[in-house]
Amino acid sequence: MAKIRVYELAKELNISSKELITLLEEEFSVEVKNHMSAIEDEDADLIKELLSGKEKSEKTKEEDDEIETTAKNPIKESINNKKSNKRDDKKEKVNTENAEDMGIITMTSDTITVKEISDKLEKSYAEVIKELMLMGVMASVNQEINFEMAEKLAAKFDMEILKEDEDEEEDLEDILKDNEEEEHLQKRSPIITVMGHVDHGKTSLLDAIRKSKVTSTEAGGITQHIGAYTVELNGEAITFLDTPGHAAFTAMRARGAQVTDIVILVVAADDGIMPQTQEAISHCKAANVPLIVAINKIDRPGANIDKVKQELTEYGLVAEDWGGDTICVPVSAHTKEGIDDLLEMILLSSEILELKANPNRKAKGTVVEAKLDKGRGAVATLLIQNGTLRVGDSIVVGSTYGRIRAMFNDKGRNIKSAGPSTPVEILGLSEVPEAGDKFYQVKDEKTARGIADKRKEKIRDEYLQSTHKVSLEDLYNQIQEGTVKELGLIVKADVQGSVEALKQSLEKLSTEEVKVRVIHGGVGAINETDVTLATASNGIILGFNVRPDNNAIIASERDGVDIKTYRVIYDAIEDIKSAMLGMLEPEFKEVVIGTAEVRQVYKISSVGTIAGAYVQTGKLARNAGARVIRDGIVIFESELASLKRFKDDAKEVAQGYECGLSIEKFNDIKEGDIIECFIMEEIKKKTL
């Protein structure tokens, strides 16, 4: 049912909002908070009838009084009436104009300067400052006053001031809604991202697709790299995001931008599944995006397609010709063999997905990439996901905004409009947005600016309140509050056997309240990619006999990702189980106080092995624990047996200095080893 705001109805009835609120409460028992509240149309019609009835009765009474007076002195009164009627008409006309002109002045923020409100009220600065002084407020032209003060000030000049609460954001919510009626939806082309291991031919495959489908009439093909492009097969378009690699894919997903419909997983026929291929598979599964496997380099002598298919089955991907549902297409980027088959499979998969959009609505989509061009200003590549975008439209992009001055397609041609699944490069934004930011078309540039300003304020507030990620210590509380329905884990170990054993044991811990899911498992040190995946999935990283590298530590501290390392699998399982049951009560916290690199090794018969080391970070302390890390894997854990600076014993050695050290019960130190020094710090018990 339609609704009308209180101030709109008051304006229509030519009465103040306060009078209307009083009338609603007394006559109709309708409670309203303020002038921005909305009431049903039925109530509005009743109020109109009531007021029109009162006006008629008052008018009848006035006419009766007028007839009575006229009867007493008809000639004189008729002359006076003519004059007064003219005056009244004139007065009524002025009042009507004033009522229309008064309108509603608005504030978009919590404060407004004296200069701005003076301009809105169309009063001189002196008049406004004088009124403020009478209200006990001393303010200069450039000083700000709050909304309550502005409201009182406006009332002094018979004006009404409103605060635009979340109207623009409400408009955006309407744009965000995808519950389109079926009759308005039309088929759209699929959006594809290419992923896979380094040197498996991702870029070569993209180039092969692009070159084979760009016609000779396009003056050498694509003249401008905009981060995405469209190719055609049998009259149907396919949009490729030219951002090979899973880093961009995950970074965009971490920002909430799900733009990809299908992922092409490139696997070299002569190399098989590699670590980055595993990560790409994990990313696709976590994002719940269908994938097509392109087995590349089939022209190479050592190509073995069946071996690749066999390895894929280990990750739950069974080829169609082996009785599964994973599409595998043998291709060669070098000879162009299988390119058309791959494109046909993409179109077939998109038909099954039934991808649709409504071109006859306000546009929305995602930023693929953006940059600052010296000659053109902020330049952004947008992928339109719904609606139609036109030159001249005003858009909000993340916390920036703008009016589209020019728009180019993937061939570098100037275009006036673009529909769903189309990549375009635009000019006209106030600032450079970030990849993954969503954009929405709004009614005008003023609205766009207002929304962008509010978003900047929100970002500032959110920055002050750090994002609360999942950690083992507060997992039980979050489960009880219902904020965690699924616990995502990234498992890294020194050998594959440990990864598999742990995955199986952890997934058995799932309960009705929370499901435990291992998003990714791999061998080797914990790296920045693992942290990025954990950030995107709001997961926890578990390491066994492995340590995080420096980049991973920095990223985890920045993003608030919890990294737990263990020596025994049983300890990890017990920790997760205890956290889920609310029994985890940590008593000690391990604090790494410094690291040193072994530069030289000396063997002394009576003493053992002495390492000459350089302290890279923090400090080394004599009574602290010590780990020997080789190629990112912990090979021994003990404590420092001795620590010397030149020939003297030292309690500690600071960063930037060299020292001599030995590890308790360990002599197999080698050059290049990293010695990690740590202490166990007692912390207060947490009640979960």
UniProtKB/Swiss-Prot annotation:
GO cellular component entries: cytosol
Cellular localization per UniProt: Cytoplasm
Stretches the record annotates as G4: 296-299
Region (Disordered): 50-95
GO molecular function, one term: translation initiation factor activity
Low complexity bias (residue ranges): 72-82
Biased composition (Basic and acidic residues): 50-62, 86-95
Region (G3) residue spans: 242-245
Highest taxon, organism lineage: Bacteria
Record keywords: Cytoplasm, GTP-binding, Initiation factor, Nucleotide-binding, Protein biosynthesis
Residue ranges, annotated region (G5): 332-334
UniProt region (G2), positions on chain: 221-225
tr-type G domain ranges (all copies): 187-354
Region annotation G1: where it falls in the sequence: 196-203
UniProt keyword Nucleus, yes or no: no
NCBIfam families with a match to the protein in the record: IF-2, small_GTP
Record's function text: One of the essential components for the initiation of protein synthesis. Protects formylmethionyl-tRNA from spontaneous hydrolysis and promotes its binding to the 30S ribosomal subunits. Also involved in the hydrolysis of GTP during the formation of the 70S ribosomal complex.
UniProt family annotation: Belongs to the TRAFAC class translation factor GTPase superfamily. Classic translation factor GTPase family. IF-2 subfamily.
Protein name listed in UniProt: Translation initiation factor IF-2
UniProt organism field: Clostridium botulinum (strain 657 / Type Ba4)
Gene: infB
